[in-house]
């Protein structure tokens, strides 16, 4: 995008001051998008042209469902319409797009998840296996915690220490978890 319409208008130069967030959760009932990422605010190194605003729209769907199965061009058109409906951008502001489908992006906590400890105990028997990130740990860690599991693992490997137990303890502190019912 050349410009966001949100917040009285924002271009790449003043984006972080007007919208400091990396992502925005969307709860509007008339759109399907669940989260909007502003890649410029993650790091300027993620954006090839510093005069452009790179955003990502995340849709929480199931692999193989109707939305997942849309051709890329139709999905892009849908997303651009939603940007307009939310007042983020005008269709003419969109310069480029890419569609990425991430299967199993979020762990599922149903079925036999109550037996997860048996799986963890089994994989712990492999001395050279470090389970990291959401998919590796089958745990809903936020991005910071997911990256931290990898960083702690790499540090331990480089130092010759077995830190697999430490890795499993990342993001187990209660203050980091949302609670229902406030």
Where are the predicted features?
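Mid-domain catalytic core of redox enzymes
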Residues: 1-73, 77-88, 122, 165-175, ...
């Amino acid at each position: 995008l050349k410009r966001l319409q949100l917040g009285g208008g924002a271009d790449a130069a003043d984006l972080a001051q007007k919208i400091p967030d990396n992502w925005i959760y969307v709860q509007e009932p008339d759109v399907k998008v669940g989260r909007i990422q502003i890649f410029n605010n993650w790091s300027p190194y993620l954006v090839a042209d510093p005069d452009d605003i790179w955003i990502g729209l995340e849709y929480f769907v199931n692999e193989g469902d109707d939305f997942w199965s849309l051709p890329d061009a139709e999905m892009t058109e849908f997303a651009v319409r939603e940007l307009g409906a939310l007042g983020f951008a005008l269709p003419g502001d969109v310069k480029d797009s890419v569609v990425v489908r991430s299967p199993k992006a979020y762990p599922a906590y149903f079925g036999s998840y109550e037996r997860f400890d048996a799986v963890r105990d089994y994989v712990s028997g492999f001395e050279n296996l470090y389970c990291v990130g959401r998919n590796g740990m089958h745990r809903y860690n936020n991005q910071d915690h997911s990256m931290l599991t990898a960083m702690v693992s790499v540090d331990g490997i480089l130092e010759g220490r077995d830190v697999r137990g430490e890795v499993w303890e990342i993001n187990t502190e209660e203050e980091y978890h949302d609670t229902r019912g406030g």
